[in-house]
Each structure stands twice: as structure tokens, then as C-alpha cells.
Amino acid sequence: MLSRVWLIALLTLVVAAAAGGAEGGFLRRSGTELLLDGKPLRLVAVNKFDLFLRYLKGGDERKQAQEALASAAAHGFTAIRFSGVGFYPVDMKNWPRQEAWWGAFDALVADAQQAGVRLIPVVNWNTSLFPDMAQECVLDMLGAPDSRSWQYLELYARQLVARYRDNETILFWELSNELNLGADLGPMRPYGYEGLNWVDLGTSYMRLRRDNYTSDDMIGYMARLAGAIRSVDSNHLIATGNSAPRPAAQHMRRQQGEMDWTPDSLDDLAAYMRDTNADPIDLISIHFYSEHDNMRFGNTDPLSAKALAQLKEAADRVGKPLYIGETGDNYEQRPDTPFLRDVLDTATRLKIPLTLVWQWDLPGDPNDVNPTRTPAAVEMMERANAAMGGG
């Protein structure tokens, strides 16, 4: 752990090095380009899922988050994606205590602004959070505006967005995390399934039949949530937080009672992207990992990122900017990170505006990226930022 004196000194250096990193107005979209201060955005930055949760806990937990924030900024990673809400119901216990909850969020935003770091809060990371709080199922939240779970979510989203709608430290809002990966799986689990069921943390005992949902259920829900956010905040752009569509996503969407894993064509991919990123959603989010998202369109090399070209082409057909909300490598098996290298090289060549690596300074996590544990990855990210003109 860093000493408090060292932390203050580092934050001072960061402000000098990142002069106005959180200045330049709000992020804007022009066709398939993202513009910040009138210039095309080109940036490699990071995820830190637990950033706000550590601020909320206080003490040493907050100190770790502050150190991670300062360290990211010092290395030129001037945007951080994180969960802007609790993960389990137990994490929400201080939500009714407005001073404790929003005081922690205000402190995070203030520290980020001082460090020159933009923030990408995910409004609802764990899809089951609000249904578990309401003792309902996911489909209630997605499809029933009068459900308790939707009312919980809408209230929280409106509180969060209204509080920071005029703050340029917020880069943009994300609605969820990988909601698309849970869609259209009903035929595989017709009676329910186990998923993040930690009853001691406030969850339901099991996921039930009504926790399944389709892409079309998701599309309606996303439109409703994005519309609620847009009605409060006209300054910030909105993204879904989705992963790259499954290689068979459009076929799965059209399935009739059984799974259809037929690989999608480029036309299918573009149609799925169009429908799942309809207005008022501004940006097309993908998460891109080895052996999950890259094995499509003829690619058989698990360490190749060439499928990014087809994903970018599909997004261009939709007419909205595509960014990589998560990517990374197996740092224990491949310390030289060949997949991440190809992702960064390909993103640079394709002029993808934003690439966010999973995940920054999470002690004990196998995906932890930091200068001590994964120096090759950090240096590679810094070089990519220099090549893009970001950082």
C-alpha cells in the first residue's frame, strides 16, 4: 500500500501530467466518430469494476481505490469503467442513507476530476440485483413498468443521472453489463437455473423460468431505460454495456423452441447490432475476448483479433461508433499477452475510439492488470495510447 503522503504527491503529479484530462466538454458523436473537445477520441483505458464499491466501504478499501485511480491516471489511462451501483442486495444497504451513498459517489467523482480521469458508470451491472431486492424475476423488471424491480431501477437511475448530468467528468453512461449474453437461452434452461445465488447476500434461492428473457425483451427494456436517462440528461451519451453479440445471436433470436447455433452472416450481425442499439442509444459496446468473441467469420486462431474488422464493419453499417468496453488476455499463461497485443494493434488500425482493458488493480484477481504484476501489458497499453495519440 502507498503511504498517504506518497498518494498526495502522486495525485499532484497526475494533475500536472494530465493537465485538464477531464476538461474539453462533453463527449459527442458525429456519425461513427466520437469527439472530445472537437477532436476524435482515441484512447486505451481500463475497467475497475469495484471502484465505487470500495469508496462506499471507506477506510482501507477507499484508500485502495484512490491509489488505483491515481496509478491509472499516472500511466495515461484516463477513463475508467466501473459499476455505478451495488452488485448484491446487501451492497445497497446504504442507498437509503443518502449522505453515505451519494457522499461516497461525490468523493469518487471529485477525485477522478482532480486526477484528470473520465468515468463510465454502469447503471445496473448485475441484472438480478433489483429483481432480488424486490423478490421478483428478471422478466418483471424487463417487461413490467409497474413492477417493484423496475421502479427500484428507474428511481436509482434517475437519482444517479440527475446528480451528475452537468458534470463533464462522466464520459458516458452504460445501461448494463453483458445483458445480451443472457438472452435467448430459455430452451437450455426451461425450468430455471443457478446464477449468482448467494442467499446470505440477499439473492433469491434459484433463478426461475421467468428469469429467462429474449433479445426482444432486452431491446424493449433497454429503450425504456435509455429513454428515462435521456429525459433527465441530454449532455451525456448512452451505451448498452453489451458484449459482442454471440456468433449465432440473430439465429438464436429467431429460434422456435430450440437452440439454433447457426453462425450469423455479416448481414445478421449488422441487423442484431442495429436492433439492440436503437435510439436513444448512441454507442455500440462490445466486449472482446480470446476464444469467446473472436472465433467467427473464418477465424480459427484463438490469439487473433481480426474479427474486430467485421464487428467494426457491422457497426459502421448501423452508423454508430463502436468501442471495446472490455478486453484482456490470460496473463498467467501468456505474460507477453499476444492476444491483447493484436487487439490493440487492430483497434489502432481500425481507429476504434476507445478500448478498455479488464481490469485495473484488483488484488488477488487472476485478471488483475497493474505495473507490478503485468508490466508487459501495461507497457503495451501505454505504447498503444502513444500510437493513437491518447493517454
Where are these regions (language model features)?
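Bacterial N-terminal signal peptides
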Residues: 6-16
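N-terminal carbohydrate-binding accessory modules
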Residues: 20-81, 92-96, 110-114, 230, ...
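Short acidic/polar active-site loop segments enriched in Thr and Asp
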Residues: 44, 78-79, 171, 282, ...
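Aromatic-lined substrate-binding rim segments of carbohydrate-active enzymes
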Residues: 60-133, 138, 161, 212-239, ...
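Active-site-adjacent "subsite" loops/lids of carbohydrate-active enzymes
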Residues: 127-162, 204-206
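Aromatic-rich peripheral "rim/lid" segments of glycoside hydrolase catalytic domains that contact
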Residues: 148, 153, 276, 334-391
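Extracellular glycoside hydrolase catalytic/binding regions
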Residues: 155-158, 162, 169, 180-353, ...
